[in-house]
């Protein structure tokens, strides 16, 4: 079914983009710490400037938010076609929907409060860690029709 394929593709692109944004956030955070201590290692000499890291992180998180959102929407429509429920009571679906809402709220706060730099990088990093941790916990806590054998 093409809807299922679109759902999987968009969801994977979204989660991957959010992971990349978290990695950019971590690099930004570590690089800013090195700059503050005036102790730049050899690894950091080839790094892009902090503002470029920040813009790459912003772009990947926006791509992740949009792609994951459309992936979740197509997943809900596919679930409705197959299961007859728009919101099946599945822990992974609930966590992904909640994570998307939290990312959307996070971006709203970033825009309203004009967060940038270190705050944005920490928010991106810890947001993804919480998201990934919740998904891993869901794998152990409950069974799901999202089993891939």
Question: What residue spans do the PLM features occupy?
Answer:
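Hydrophobic cores of alpha-helical transmembrane segments in multi-pass inner/ER membrane proteins
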Residues: 10-28, 98-107
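Juxtamembrane inter-helical linkers in multi-pass membrane proteins
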Residues: 35-51
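Alpha-helical transmembrane segments of helical membrane proteins, especially in multi-pass transport
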Residues: 55-82
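Short alpha-helical packing/oligomerization segments
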Residues: 79-104
């Amino acid at each position: 079914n093409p809807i299922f394929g679109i759902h999987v593709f968009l969801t994977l692109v979204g989660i991957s983009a959010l992971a990349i944004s978290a990695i950019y956030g971590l690099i930004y955070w570590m690089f800013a710490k090195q700059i503050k201590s005036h102790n730049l290692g050899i690894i950091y000499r080839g790094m892009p400037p902090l503002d470029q890291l920040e813009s790459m992180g912003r772009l990947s998180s926006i791509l992740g938010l949009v792609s994951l959102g459309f992936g979740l929407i197509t997943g809900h429509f596919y679930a409705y076609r197959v299961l007859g429920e728009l919101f099946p009571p599945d822990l992974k679906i609930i966590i992904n929907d909640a994570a998307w809402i939290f990312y959307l709220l996070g971006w709203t706060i970033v825009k309203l409060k004009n967060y940038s730099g270190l705050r944005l990088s920490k928010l991106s990093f810890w947001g993804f860690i919480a998201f990934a941790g919740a998904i891993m916990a869901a794998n152990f806590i409950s069974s799901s029709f999202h089993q891939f054998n």
